[in-house]
Every structure is written in C-alpha cells, then in structure tokens.
C-alpha cells in the first residue's frame, strides 16, 4: 500500500513540508490573535500540537498526499468541532435544568467539540485510505488503458 516515491529534489521536499505545515501555522496564528479563549483550540495547543506537526512532517517524506490530506483535514475538523461544540453547548445551556448543572462534567453542559473533531478526523482519514486503496488505482488503470 505504501511505497516510497522516486527521489525528490530538495525543493520538492521543502514544498511538501510547507504544504503540510501551512494549515497548522495559520491555525496557530489565528488562535494566538483571535481565538485564544476557546475550549478546543486551547486543548489542542496544550496536548499534542507540536507532536502532530513533527509526525506529519516526517510522514510527508514517505506519503506526501496522505500528509497533506491529514493536515488540512485536521485543521478543518478542529474548526468545525470547535464551532459545533460551542453551538451545542450554548443551545444546551438554554434548556438546562438544575439537575444538569450538578452533572456538568460529563453531560449536556460539557463541550462536545473534542468528540466532534475526533469523529470527523477519523472519517477524513478513513475516506482518504479508501480512496487511495480503491479509487486511485482504478483511475490510474483507466488512464493507462486510454494511453494517457
């Protein structure tokens, strides 16, 4: 499934690294400037942000397409998860009962953005792997039959 592509020039390697790390740099800067008091962004920065940058940077040497899809998918899923989690939390606060405030650590008054992010990101990765294993070989075979 995973084959190392042909030798790349240093310019191609740098370009792949920049393409992989660009969405993280933009998200990090946006969090520092405008979104600094939000739940999911703070959680991501304090937990594994740098490790993910490093891991995807290394993966970009072996599988550049996967690394690009993973990085842009990650950023999109974080943004969607944060926004949907905040909307769900605000909506649940409007309809909360006193009993809901007692169990606020794991109930309808907790921020669901982390789980939304995780499910969306898992879906993005599964869809890419399915595309890479099933659809992409068919497209290549069809192009070869046509002589392109």
Name what the model sees in each region:
Residues 28-36, 77, 81, 85-89, ...:
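Membrane-water interface at transmembrane helix exits
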